[in-house]
Structure formats: C-alpha cells, structure tokens
C-alpha cells in the first residue's frame, strides 16, 4: 500500500515537472479597411426578394470603393442561415417598402454570412458576437452605428438615420 501511494505521488510530480507553460499570442484585429479577398456567400433564401439592392461583389473592398465614389455609407447585415432572428428581420423588417426604399436611396447594402469561409474574416474585422448584427459604416469601413440582435423596423430606421447623420457631418 505504501509503495502504491509513493508511486502515485511520483507520477504526479513527474507530470508537473514536464508540464510546459504555453502562451497564446492574439493577433491584433485588422482595421475595417483591411483588404478582404475572400468571396461573399450568396444571399440567404428570399433575401433578394426583400427589395434591398444588395451589392453583388465577391469582396467588401469594392463595395467600400463604390461607396466612396457615391459618397454613401454602407449597410452591412451579418447573418447566418440557421439564425431564426435573422429570418424574422428579413421577413418583418427588410421586406417593408419604406425600409428597403430608404436603404436603396441612402446606402449601399452588403450582406455577410458569418459561417461562410468568405464571411468569417469580415465578421472578425467587425468583431461580430451574435446575429443578426447590422452595422452602418462610412466608405472607409469605419463603423458609424452598430445594432446587435432582432430589432423592429422603427428601431432599424432610427439607427440608419443616426448613421446617415454621422456620415453627413
């Protein structure tokens, strides 16, 4: 019995002696204007039926460049195909004519599937923590307004109005 206890203590001490201390190096988050060369995922089912004129680009950078030419902010919608609240926003907010007309007139709209290989880097740039997330950015990619979670059409319009006002300053 004594030998068993001594053996167990020896094994524990040996395990402690060989344990290496590891450090995790966190890379700095890239700036929103960082080049993202990945392609974007296609719109979720029905998204094109909302009336929003989604930018058809395989990268975010050309959308920002177009926003600079047009002097417009960009509406970024971060979603996931499995996200129930994302589908509710699509159905109850983005399908309203006053919302999509307002977006089409005042913003360039771009959507990002956070689970796609091409959407993940963009979601990392903007530190997306949940879906749906809407971010309004200036043509340089700097966030003007951010809203996380399911929101009403009236709240969405207030956030968009605020972003537009900040853009005009």
Map each language-model feature to its residues.
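Non-catalytic, surface beta->alpha helical segment in thiol-disulfide oxidoreductase systems
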Residues: 129-169
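C-terminal motif of bacterial Sec signal peptides marking the signal peptidase cleavage site
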Residues: 14-15
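Short, low-complexity, disordered segments immediately C-terminal to signal peptides
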Residues: 20-34
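Short active-site neighborhood of thiol/selenol oxidoreductases, capturing the structured segment around
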Residues: 69-84
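A short beta-strand-turn-helix
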Residues: 54-73, 103
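Positively charged n-region of N-terminal signal peptides that target proteins for export
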Residues: 1-5
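Conserved redox-active cysteine motifs that mediate thiol-disulfide chemistry
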Residues: 80-94
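Thiol-based oxidoreductase modules, predominantly thioredoxin-like and allied folds used
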Residues: 54-57, 92-118
